């Protein structure tokens, strides 16, 4: 099975298809001080048409601080990309649910190895 979008897919559908199979995406946020586009690879969970992100250093993560100022980002996966609206949340039960989704996808040991703080998560919604 190819990870490339099909020719007749809309850009949004192509991105959704890649998100359903991928392990890493690139996000591009706007720097809160510089105003410049900043891109970074991140892990994610795509479930029920929802894209969940978990900042590796929780609320201390720079890209997270940037989306607090401008709650949108560009998401790219293997040649498909799109703008998403970002909804950060701090509710402990919701954050814990996202952490569990990450553990299920990437393994508890890798999540423990790479993620140091679990006080925030982000829901990114396609526009």
Please provide the spans of the model-predicted regions.
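Extreme N-terminal tail/first-helix region
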Residues: 1-24
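Short, structured beta-strand-loop surface elements
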Residues: 3-5, 58-127
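Generic signal for short, ordered secondary-structure residues
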Residues: 13-14, 46, 77, 81
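Covalent nucleotidyltransferase core used to form phosphodiester bonds in nucleic acids
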Residues: 15-17, 52-65
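Extracellular/periplasmic catalytic domains that process cell-envelope and extracellular macromolecules
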Residues: 19, 45, 115
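Short beta-strand segments
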Residues: 22-56, 73
């Amino acid at each position: 099975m190819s990870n490339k979008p099909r020719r007749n897919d809309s850009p949004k559908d192509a991105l959704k298809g890649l998100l359903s199979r991928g392990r890493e995406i690139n996000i591009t946020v706007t720097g809160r001080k510089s105003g410049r586009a900043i891109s970074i690879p991140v892990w994610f969970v795509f479930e029920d048409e929802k894209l969940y992100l978990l900042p590796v250093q929780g609320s201390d993560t720079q890209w997270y601080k940037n989306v607090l100022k401008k709650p949108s980002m560009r998401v790219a996966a293997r040649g498909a990309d799109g703008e998403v609206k970002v909804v950060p949340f701090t509710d402990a039960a919701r954050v814990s649910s996202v952490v569990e989704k990450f553990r299920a996808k990437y393994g508890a040991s890798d999540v423990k190895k790479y993620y140091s703080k679990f006080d925030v998560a982000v829901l990114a919604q396609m526009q």
